[in-house]
């Protein structure tokens, strides 16, 4: 059994395989090796891949360039995930090829929202100091 990463609860093996899948998905999208119709895969960024403990399922967090049409992009990737998986099988030499579930990556929107709240809080503190 692998060692557990204390801050996330993922094993080293999950992290290593996830990173390997992430790198290869990025290459597949850049080179359009999956030949997915109706979207330009060159504009898709894979921000993170999380593996299940049995390494049979990979959650790929994706975001299209500019964050536009995210829901549409994820639904097309999900529809053609068998093509992505086939392209991935040519690149990876692992016992079980994981099933890929594509997920919208909203972390940038979340970070932007937090940054706005921090700026608003700093502005309020500055105004309070000015009037005291």
Each language-model region and where it sits:
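Charge-rich, low-complexity N-terminal segments
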Residues: 1-57, 63-132
């Amino acid at each position: 059994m692998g060692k557990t990463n204390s801050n996330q609860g993922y094993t080293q093996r999950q992290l290593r395989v996830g990173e390997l899948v992430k790198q290869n998905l990025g290459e597949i999208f850049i080179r359009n090796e999956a030949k997915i119709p109706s979207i330009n895969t060159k504009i898709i960024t894979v921000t993170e891949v999380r593996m299940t403990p049995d390494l049979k399922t990979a959650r790929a967090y994706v975001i299209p360039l500019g964050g536009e049409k995210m829901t549409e992009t994820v639904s097309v990737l999900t529809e053609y995930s068998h093509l992505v998986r086939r392209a991935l099988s040519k690149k990876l030499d692992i016992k079980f090829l994981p099933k890929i579930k594509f997920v919208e990556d909203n972390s940038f929107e979340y970070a932007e929202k937090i940054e706005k709240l921090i700026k608003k809080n700093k502005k309020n503190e500055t105004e309070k100091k000015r009037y005291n």
